[in-house]
């Protein structure tokens, strides 16, 4: 009986040891996605917004060519990875059922070195995300709706 309990605890601890790094890695990828692409309450959404937000989020060394910020409720973005607000789009990609307000910042000028100058494009778009364990970890594209 004691040996059975010891074996159970050993197997449990090994399983926990294998699961925690995976969960931590997924959580890192999700947090990285949010840091690069989520801004729930933007101010301005113009060229100045792009330049300051890209700089503040450390996306300017070297200057990133293009980056899209998704605005709105984080729960609705997460829901793309399930049936509540998403449909399959191929592989591990999902397309949102509803459009999101987005700002796309595109590098203006040719140099990848700071100071980075960006042009902002605002719009409402359906977005395509890559999901892992029910969370978005990659913004694949955004699709303009007429």
Swiss-Prot record:
It is found in: Secreted; Nucleus; Nucleus, Nucleolus; Cytoplasm, Stress granule. CDD domains: RNase_A_canonical. InterPro entries: RNaseA, RNaseA-like_dom_sf, RNaseA_AS, RNaseA_domain. Secreted ribonuclease that can either promote or restrict cell proliferation of target cells, depending on the context. Endocytosed in target cells via its receptor PLXNB2 and translocates to the cytoplasm or nucleus. Under stress conditions, localizes to the cytoplasm and promotes the assembly of stress granules (SGs): specifically cleaves a subset of tRNAs within anticodon loops to produce tRNA-derived stress-induced fragments (tiRNAs), resulting in translation repression and inhibition of cell proliferation. tiRNas also prevent formation of apoptosome, thereby promoting cell survival. Coiled coil: none annotated. One of its GO terms (biological process) is defense response to Gram-positive bacterium. A motif (Nucleolar localization signal) lies at residues 55-59. The active site is at residues 37, 138. Keywords: Angiogenesis, Cytoplasm, Developmental protein, Differentiation, Disulfide bond, DNA-binding, Endonuclease, Hydrolase, Nuclease, Nucleus, Protein synthesis inhibitor, Pyrrolidone carboxylic acid, Secreted, Signal, Stress response. Belongs to the pancreatic ribonuclease family. Its main location: secreted. One of its GO terms (cellular component) is angiogenin-PRI complex. Residues 1-24 form the signal peptide. Disulfide bonds join 50-105, 63-116, 81-131. The lineage of its organism: Eukaryota, Metazoa, Chordata, Craniata, Vertebrata. Transmembrane segments: none annotated. Has weak tRNA ribonuclease activity by itself due to partial autoinhibition by its C-terminus, which folds into a short alpha-helix that partially occludes the substrate-binding site. In absence of stress, the ribonuclease activity is inhibited by RNH1 in the cytoplasm. In response to stress, dissociates from RNH1 in the cytoplasm and associates with cytoplasmic ribosomes with vacant A-sites: ribosomes directly activate the tRNA ribonuclease activity of ANG by refolding the C-terminal alpha-helix. In response to stress, the angiogenic activity of ANG is inhibited by RNH1 in the nucleus. Homodimer. Interacts with RNH1; inhibiting ANG ribonuclease activity. Interacts with PCNA. TRNA binds at residues 45, 105, 127. This is Angiogenin. The keyword DNA-binding applies. Its EC number is 3.1.27.-.
């Amino acid at each position: 009986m004691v040996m059975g309990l010891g074996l159970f605890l050993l197997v449990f601890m090994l399983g926990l040891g294998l699961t925690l790094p995976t969960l931590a890695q997924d959580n890192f990828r999700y947090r990285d996605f949010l840091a690069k692409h989520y801004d729930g309450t933007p101010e301005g959404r113009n060229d100045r917004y792009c330049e300051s937000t890209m700089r503040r989020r450390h996306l300017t060394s070297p200057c990133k060519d293009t980056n899209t910020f998704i605005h709105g409720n984080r729960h609705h973005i997460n829901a793309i990875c399930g049936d509540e607000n998403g449909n399959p789009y191929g592989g591990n990609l999902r397309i949102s059922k509803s459009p999101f307000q987005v700002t796309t910042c595109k590098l203006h000028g040719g140099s990848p070195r700071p100071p980075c100058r960006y042009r902002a494009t605002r719009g409402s778009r359906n977005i395509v995300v890559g999901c892992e364990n029910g969370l978005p970890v990659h913004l694949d594209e955004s699709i303009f709706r007429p």
